[in-house]
């Protein structure tokens, strides 16, 4: 399945191999415990043997050439095999201060056919079937070089594994090479060479039995892995046609840190069963709630330990518990609830939009319990976890991941996922269907602004600022050019050198005759070479350089003043200087640095992926200086600026253009206001035109929407029917809880209060006071928020406005902190303001026209915030006056 778009790509470095220390520590970390005594002893043993392992690796490295030569002479005849080793891979270092026994092998590597034949007879190892000595001349020099290189690589991997203390690096890099070498020459010959290398390496440590055991152990593993067949890929088959079928090479799973599978068995001890239950808590609640909060499901745990309840049903029960509901359902919108549920119960993220729509509809129709049942009863859960296995995170190195949700998958599997309120997958899937934005191919945050450039991927917890970019190889970003459109270099490359005139930027050009410069646009500047030098510094560095920095580029400036180098060469030397590299190359990411240099030298941002990839290739292959030469020697630079023109801004992004335009307009309006005569305010306040009634009414509204006139007052009277009374009850729920009660509660918590209100036993005011003091209101609007936010929500629900000032917030905060929520609600409902505005039988509503002008913006912001979408405190912005603060 071809995917044309993918999510943002975080920096992921797969584990290349395992070491003894990392494997021990990670196992304890996965179980959320300290290292046990046996594990500590293993670490001590490994660390104590570190010096011995380093000595063994050092001796093997010093004798690498001879070991490779002995192995090559075993399988090659008719010439000197070692002469084809292009360069020695081992580094010979002089150890003056290290007292260790220097062991070296001696021998003549220039052997002949007779010695090779005798060595085959003397060898104790049985020759593998199909082995024949290889003639050097017939084999060819190219193949000989590759074969000697491969033998040296085998020895190098062996030393890596010895130092790491784990043969995993051999399994990852050697397994499967047999098929590859069989296609090139002979795998049997490679086996014979490795055996000879083992024999020679062991003979080095003739007086060190422990070193011989270590070398023989790792050589045996190397030969076994080489002779073993290659691993098959891990296939992830899918049951639906809307999701990808995936394939992962086994080396990724073998090199990575394996996740421990926690499987409940009746034969386990009580302690082992407890560890399985803790793993379930860590997977579902993302932490061990027994250790963190002293919470546990004692009855369910006892049933699991007794065998009457499976792990699958245990996961189902704790997922439906009030603890899970409070932590991962109530604080989030439904879209995010679905994403987190996939992480907790299936160990992965969403795969497609169709999958999201399916489970979102289940959550909407059947609630959280229905969603959990659908996930746990799915075929995928049964295939991966069955009845007794605790779910686990199926991330990198566990199984293949989809490319279209690569970035958000990693973000979801992080520990910080519950802190992100915004749904990521549905936002990403919706972006797939949108038109191409005018952005850089490397990310949304990569638009080349004057203050923001390069590969910048902002990581935000509140807003998805790192979205996908559907750019292919041949997609080009839209850039704006000052001046006529017919001068665009895309449609008219010959017009690159044409001056735009007064429509474009100021162009500084050196006159090669008298060593002065002229400006096409600004004729009042003096013909001083100092000006053009300053223009070059401003263009290259973006500022004037300091005196300390100037000392390192003074020699280039002197050459330029004496007309020994041109403007282009002067810029070349400046960009290659240590000052420029320390500012704009060494501390930045490569993409970010290339973007900046490209913009400074060519006067425009890069067009897209294809253009910037060629700079990547030059930097990695030939270095930084070659990339600078490539830019300054390019046909675009020569046609646009030549040798004696200072580069200038030729193209700009639309976002940067808008940014500069807004700032210019703001600056112009500010200066114009300052220069205006302030004494004319009386004259300017006179009305010159004749205004109609509609014009006056429009001015009175002051930009406020018509919503303030479109409200309905729900009032309970003696003549109200049963239907009207039910409408009043629903209006109260919508005002106090900001939504219908049935959307988040069972609906029968206040059945007795509703009957009393319908039977006229209590008033609307008393009914509101009772539901405001209920546990449901406390759970929704008191427990999740700080006191200041509770006060804001309380005035919104019961008085229809935001807090008037800080003094009012402090007053209610004292009541809330000392007497609790019930007293706070009682004070609000029984206040003079409530009685004057609403009385005893009117449902509170949003008060538009009666609000003071200073408090209107805060009330507007408070009411426009979606229900429970933000816990941000709306701080009133009042002028500090006595009594207000």
Curated annotation (Swiss-Prot):
This protein's UniProt keywords: Antenna complex, Bile pigment, Chloroplast, Chromophore, Electron transport, Lyase, Membrane, Photosynthesis, Phycobilisome, Plastid, Repeat, Thylakoid, Transport
UniProt binding sites for (2R,3E)-phycocyanobilin: 185
Residue ranges occupied by any PBS-linker domain in the UniProt entry: 242-422, 498-680, 694-871
Lyase in keyword set: yes
GO cellular component: chloroplast thylakoid membrane; phycobilisome
Main location: plastid
Cross-referenced SUPFAM superfamilies: Globin-like
Biological processes annotated in GO: photosynthesis
Subcellular location: Plastid, Chloroplast thylakoid membrane
EC number(s) on file: 4.-.-.-
Topological type in the membrane: Peripheral membrane protein
Entries under InterPro entries matching the protein: Globin-like_sf, PBS_linker_dom, PBS_linker_sf, Phycobilisome_asu/bsu, Phycobilisome_asu/bsu_sf
Changes after translation: Contains one covalently linked bilin chromophore. This protein autochromophorylates (Potential).
A GO term, aspect molecular function: lyase activity
Family, per entry: Belongs to the phycobilisome linker protein family.
Role noted for this protein: This protein is postulated to act both as terminal energy acceptor and as a linker polypeptide that stabilizes the phycobilisome architecture. May have intrinsic bilin lyase activity.
Protein name per UniProt: Phycobiliprotein ApcE
Lineage: Eukaryota, Rhodophyta, Florideophyceae, Rhodymeniophycidae, Ceramiales
Name of the coding gene: apcE
């Amino acid at each position: 399945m071809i995917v044309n778009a993918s999510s943002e790509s975080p920096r992921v470095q797969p584990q290349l191999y395992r070491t003894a220390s990392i494997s021990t520590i990670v196992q304890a970390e996965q179980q959320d415990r300290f290292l046990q005594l046996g594990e500590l002893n293993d670490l001590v043993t490994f660390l104590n043997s570190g010096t011995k392992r380093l000595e063994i690796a050092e001796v093997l490295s010093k004798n690498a050439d001879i070991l490779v030569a002995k192995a090559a002479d075993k399988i090659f005849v008719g010439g000197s095999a070692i002469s084809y080793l292009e360069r020695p891979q081992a580094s010979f270092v002089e150890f003056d201060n290290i007292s260790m026994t220097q062991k070296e092998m001696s021998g003549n590597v220039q052997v002949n056919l007779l010695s090779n034949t005798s060595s085959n007879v003397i060898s104790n190892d049985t020759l593998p079937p199909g082995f024949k000595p290889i003639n050097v001349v017939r084999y060819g020099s190219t193949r000989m070089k590759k074969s000697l290189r491969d033998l040296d690589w085998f020895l190098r991997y062996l030393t890596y594994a010895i130092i790491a203390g784990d043969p995993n690096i051999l399994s990852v890099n050697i397994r499967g090479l047999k098929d590859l070498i069989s296609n090139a020459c002979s795998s049997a010959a490679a086996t014979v060479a490795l055996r000879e290398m083992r024999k020679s390496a062991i003979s080095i440590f003739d007086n060190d039995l422990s070193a011989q055991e270590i070398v023989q152990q790792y050589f045996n593993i190397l030969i076994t892995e080489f002779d073993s067949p290659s691993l098959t890929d891990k296939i992830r088959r899918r049951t639906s046609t809307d999701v990808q079928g995936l394939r992962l090479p086994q080396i990724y799973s073998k090199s990575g840190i394996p996740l421990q599978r926690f499987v409940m068995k009746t034969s386990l001890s009580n302690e082992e069963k407890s560890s399985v239950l803790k793993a379930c808590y860590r997977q579902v609640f993302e932490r061990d709630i027994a250790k963190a909060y002293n919470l546990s499901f004692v009855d369910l745990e006892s049933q699991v330990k007794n065998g009457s309840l499976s792990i699958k049903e245990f996961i189902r029960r704790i997922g439906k518990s009030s603890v899970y509901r409070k932590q991962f359902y109530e604080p989030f919108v439904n879209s995010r609830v679905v994403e987190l549920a996939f992480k907790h119960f299936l160990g992965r993220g969403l795969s497609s939009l169709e999958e999201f729509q399916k489970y979102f509809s289940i959550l909407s129709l059947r609630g959280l319990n229905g969603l959990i049942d659908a996930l746990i009863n799915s075929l995928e859960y049964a295939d991966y976890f069955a009845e007794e296995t605790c779910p686990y995170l199926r991330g990198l190195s566990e199984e293949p991941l989809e490319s279209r949700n690569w970035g958000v998958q990693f973000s979801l599997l992080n520990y910080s996922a519950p802190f992100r309120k915004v749904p990521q997958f549905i936002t990403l899937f919706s972006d797939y269907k949108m038109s191409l934005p005018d952005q850089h191919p490397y990310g949304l945050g990569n638009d080349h602004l004057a203050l923001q450039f390069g590969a910048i991927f902002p990581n935000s917890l509140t807003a998805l600022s790192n979205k996908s970019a559907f750019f292919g190889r041949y997609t080009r970003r839209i850039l704006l050019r000052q001046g006529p459109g017919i001068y665009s270099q895309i449609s008219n490359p010959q017009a690159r050198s044409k001056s735009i005139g007064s429509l474009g930027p100021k162009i500084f050009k050196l006159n090669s005759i008298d060593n002065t410069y002229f400006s096409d646009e600004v004729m009042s500047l003096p013909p001083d070479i100092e000006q053009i030098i300053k223009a070059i510094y401003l263009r290259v560095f973006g500022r004037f350089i300091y005196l300390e920095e100037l000392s390192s580029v003074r020699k280039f400036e002197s050459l330029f003043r004496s007309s020994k180098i041109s403007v282009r060469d002067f810029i070349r030397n400046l960009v290659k200087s240590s000052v420029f590299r320390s500012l704009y190359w060494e501390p930045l990411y490569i993409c970010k640095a290339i973007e900046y240099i490209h913009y400074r030298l060519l006067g425009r941002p890069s067009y897209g992926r294809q253009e910037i990839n060629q700079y990547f290739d030059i930097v990695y292959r030939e270095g930084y200086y070659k990339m600078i030469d490539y830019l300054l020697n390019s046909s675009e630079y020569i046609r646009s600026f030549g040798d004696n023109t200072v580069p200038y801004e030729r193209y700009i992004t639309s976002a940067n253009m808008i940014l500069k335009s807004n700032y210019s307009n703001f600056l112009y309006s500010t200066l114009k206001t300052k220069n205006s005569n302030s004494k004319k305010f009386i004259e300017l306040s006179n009305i010159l035109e004749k205004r109609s009634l509609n014009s006056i009414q429009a001015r009175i509204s002051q930009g406020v929407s018509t919503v303030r006139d479109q409200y309905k007052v729900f009032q309970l009277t003696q003549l109200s029917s049963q239907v009207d009374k039910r409408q009043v009850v629903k209006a109260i729920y919508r005002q106090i809880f900001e939504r219908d009660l049935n959307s988040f509660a069972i609906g029968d918590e206040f059945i007795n209060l509703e009957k009393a209100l319908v039977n006229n036993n209590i008033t609307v005011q008393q009914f509101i006071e009772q539901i405001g003091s209920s546990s449901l209101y406390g759970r929704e609007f008191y427990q999740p928020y700080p006191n200041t936010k509770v006060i804001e929500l309380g005035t919104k629900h019961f008085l229809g406005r935001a807090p008037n000032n800080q003094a009012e917030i402090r007053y209610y905060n004292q009541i809330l902190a000392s007497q609790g929520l019930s007293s706070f609600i009682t004070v609000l409902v029984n206040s003079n303001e409530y009685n004057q505005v609403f009385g005893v039988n009117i449902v509170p509503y949003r008060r538009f026209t009666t609000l003071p002008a200073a408090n209107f913006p805060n009330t507007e912001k408070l009411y426009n915030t979606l229900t429970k979408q933000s816990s941000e405190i709306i701080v009133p912005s009042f002028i500090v006056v006595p009594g207000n603060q």
